[in-house]
């Protein structure tokens, strides 16, 4: 009988790093496209975290900082406390006109008492008019804040805390003239061409040069009804 051919020699074992590579789980082809985008998404994510947001300007930006002087009495969110609430339209019910609110903040309870003025806001307010000293004593911030700070914080109280709609027919003009970033009345107060302490009718024009109807602030007087 013919001799049997010699058995083939067994293959040499793979080096450990080759064996490990063969045993490693392979990444599916479909996942490769996703993984290839990870550096791009990572860059965009980090950029979003590090880019500084655009800072707000104008009365509302200043007003939120000035409101720290008011929060202890009226609540951090305007919910009330020692002083009346501002939230949910409350301050708008009391002061349909921003000028009346500014005047009361300037003179406070003592100023109105000395002038003999009892009703500082809307005399026809639903639920009854608010009277001077009816709930705590309002400080006279005309001696503590600048005039443009007073306007700014009142813009914050009306449009942020109380929820006045700056796009509504009722408040669009007031917001544009007093509380927008380019508000001409606020700018006039800031530059000193309109003083909150004057009893004279202020002369302020809009961007088109048309006069803006503004009630003088001046000395304490009874508040005005809506309309």
Please provide the spans of the model-predicted regions:
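N-terminal intrinsically disordered, acidic low-complexity segments at the extreme N-terminus
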Residues: 1-15
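Short, Lys/Arg-rich cytosolic juxtamembrane segment immediately N-terminal
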Residues: 16-28
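Flexible coil segments in periplasmic/lumen-exposed cytochrome c-class electron-transfer proteins
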Residues: 16-18, 115-227
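Hydrophobic membrane-insertion alpha-helices, especially the h-region
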Residues: 27-45
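The canonical Cys-X-X-Cys-His
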Residues: 63-76, 138, 153-157
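Gly/Gly-Pro-rich "capping" loops immediately C-terminal to redox-active cysteine motifs
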Residues: 75-146
């Amino acid at each position: 009988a013919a001799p049997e051919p010699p058995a083939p020699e067994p293959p040499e074992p793979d080096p450990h790093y080759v064996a490990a590579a063969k045993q490693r789980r392979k990444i599916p082809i479909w996942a490769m496209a996703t993984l290839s985008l990870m550096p791009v998404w990572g860059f965009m994510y980090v950029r979003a975290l590090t880019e500084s947001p655009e800072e707000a300007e104008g009365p509302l930006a200043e007003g939120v900082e000035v409101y720290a002087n008011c929060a202890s009495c009226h609540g951090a969110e305007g919910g009330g406390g020692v002083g009346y609430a501002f939230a949910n339209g409350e301050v708008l019910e009391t002061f349909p006109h921003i000028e009346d609110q500014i005047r009361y903040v300037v003179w406070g309870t003592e100023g109105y008492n000395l002038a003999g003025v009892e009703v500082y806001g809307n005399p026809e307010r639903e639920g009854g008019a608010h009277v001077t000293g009816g709930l705590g004593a309002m400080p006279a911030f005309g001696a503590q804040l600048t005039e443009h700070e007073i306007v700014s914080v009142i813009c914050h109280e009306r449009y942020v805390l109380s929820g006045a709609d700056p796009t509504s027919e009722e408040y669009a003009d007031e917001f544009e003239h007093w509380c927008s970033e380019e508000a001409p009345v606020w700018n006039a107060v800031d530059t000193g061409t309109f003083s909150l302490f004057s009893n004279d009718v202020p002369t302020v024009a809009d961007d088109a040069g048309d006069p803006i109807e503004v009630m003088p602030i001046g000395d304490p007087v009874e508040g005005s009804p809506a309309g």
